[in-house]
Each structure stands twice: as C-alpha cells, then as structure tokens.
Design a protein with these regions (language model features):
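SAM-dependent methyltransferase
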Residues: 19-90
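Short Gly/Pro-enriched turn/cap motifs at secondary-structure boundaries
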Residues: 8, 49-51, 126-128
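Sequence-level detector for tyrosine residue identity
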Residues: 4, 41-44, 77, 102, ...
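C-terminal lobe and adjacent flexible extensions of AdoMet/dcAdoMet transferase-like proteins
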Residues: 81-141
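A short glycine-rich, Lys/Arg-flanked "PGG" loop and its adjoining helix->strand segment in the class I
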Residues: 1-17
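A short hydrophobic/small-residue beta-strand
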Residues: 18-19, 98
Length: 141
C-alpha cells in the first residue's frame, strides 16, 4: 500500500490532491447482508468474511431486478480493512504534506430514533463511533 501511495503522490501535479474513501464501524465487519431497495431492483451489500487477526475481509454485491432471479456475486471485493490513522500515517510516509479527514454529518432521527448520515462531509479530527460509517481522506501533495 505504501508503494501505491508513493506512486499516487509522484503522479500528482504540484498542489494536487489524492482522495480516498473508507468505511468502518462494528456493523461493517459483521457477516450480514444489507438490502437497499430502489425502484425496480434491489441492491445487496454482503460482508461474507472478516478475519479479526488480519483485518482481511471479503464483500460481495448482488442485484435483483423485479421479476428476475437474484444475480449473486456480481462484484467480489477482498481487501484489508484499514483504519483512518493507519492510512494517514502511510500517506505522510509516502510524501503527502498534509491529510484531512472528512466525517459525515447526521440527519435528524427517524420515528424509531435511528440516525443516518446526511451526505454532507466536514473536516474534523474527532468523531463519535457509529455502527457503520463512511469517511474520506484528502491528501495534499
């Protein structure tokens, strides 16, 4: 990963920015399936495996169109789950002059008291642990 970050740094113009997205939280490493329903189809995000000794994991995306059979394992992802600070440390080691973590704001609680992200991200160095989260890192050359 360090070599990849070094290559990304070298490929940027002066003043360039390299963005990464990452996700985490306790729900993100549980073997389960999240189902998202859209008009005419369902999208499935499945955590198929998580190894707590190595943080290696496998995720899959499945789809089902209305009136059709479910298409399983359309996309398979196998990677290591990295933490925000691990990545920021590696980015600094790769030569980036500055990194900024962006955290998602929260929407108003629903009738069950559940709170989700509002789609707006802001720079911060502190965040509450959420069941699941998505965040971004901006890395300046």
């Amino acid at each position: 990963l360090l070599e990849y970050f070094k290559a990304a740094h070298a490929a940027l113009n002066d003043g360039g920015v390299f963005f990464l997205d990452l996700f985490g939280g306790p729900d993100s490493i549980q073997e389960n399936v999240d189902v998202i329903t859209h008009e005419g189809f369902k999208y499935y995000w499945e955590c198929q495996m998580f190894n707590p000794m190595t943080n290696d994991c496998r995720f899959a995306i499945h789809f089902k169109r209305k009136g059709e059979q479910k298409r399983k394992d359309c996309f398979i992802y196998e990677w290591r789950m990295w933490g925000m600070m691990e990545l920021r440390d590696l980015l600094e080691e790769a030569g980036f002059s500055k990194t900024i973590g962006y955290w998602e704001g929260e929407e108003e609680p629903d009738e069950d008291g559940d709170v989700g992200g509002d789609g707006n991200f802001y720079p911060t160095e502190e965040a509450e642990q959420c069941e699941a989260w998505v965040t971004y890192i901006a890395s300046m050359k």
